[in-house]
Amino acid sequence: DYIVGTSMGSIIGGLYAIGYTPQQLDSMVKKQDWTFLLSDRIKRSQQTMSEREKSETFVLSLPLTGKRFKEQASGGVIKGQNLANLFSDLTVGYHDSIDFNKLPIPFACVSENVVNGKEIVFHDGVLSTAMRASMAIPGVFTPVRIDGMVLVDGGMKNNYPVNVAKAIGAEIII
């Protein structure tokens, strides 16, 4: 058995590969605060008083000049740190650079390097980072930068990574 995914498939596939059951995944999806996860907000309990006052003033604030504007204009509206934190929490025990073939179910996920347009297949590395890179939808989430690469959602290059599954030895592909 192998699991290969891109975008949301990399998240579900990566978590399933390390042992989460379909019931656990379903429960996780239902209990998440998606408004928080799909934002760059900091939990109120972790904010300073001035941050609380500022966050309660506007529903949405986007800078129109400066470094932060350039980052958002060239990347995505959402940095994705809250999602990255969730992925990190869910993959405890798999934070070191690891061989994804040695997971309980061998796993690979796909991303695209926008610097050169090449498909990047993660067979190893930090699982949560690979998952985050594979779902970095351009314009929505900032790309993930690794070793000079600027990585975005794998679905931009290979939405159905059947070729990757075949390359690692899968015979029956669902």
Language-model region placement:
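Acidic, glycine-enriched active-site microenvironments
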Residues: 12
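Patatin-like phospholipase
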Residues: 1-6, 15-174
